[in-house]
């Protein structure tokens, strides 16, 4: 039979656990601030003033704020989020086509390839109709972006010395692939000897795809 003292301790632990959990839950409920459609509009204005964003990213942000708060408006929260996004578009604070061009251009200048650009615009919720021009431009800049990547990483023509180790070469090809470049284009650039400016200049301007 259990010791009486042990039973007392066990019961105290159970009571503490029960009331402690209730207390924490109550504090959590109290910390959920009320949120209305008007406040949602204010949050959106602050967000677009601070960040360049897409419609999808803004609506995700607003939806998260709704989840973290106590919705007190009569309108449906999801409908309210979409209505706020509509208003931001009418005010020209949101323009997915312009955002896509800016985002793709920045990625290309950082040496990232077409595949990474496409993937990022998809994640950002950009529709095909709004991303098409940006993706086409990234395709036209594929060689320049890959050369920029090689320069940043000191691969191929930008290496201090030639590296003929096959394993090292494949690691470099893999790095190009992770950056969104085609394997064929990566191998063309890596085949250029260090310091051979003429061979580097002779690379095609068009993107090479697998």
Language-model features, listed with the residues they occupy:
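An alpha-helical, amphipathic repeat domain used for nucleic-acid recognition
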Residues: 2-210
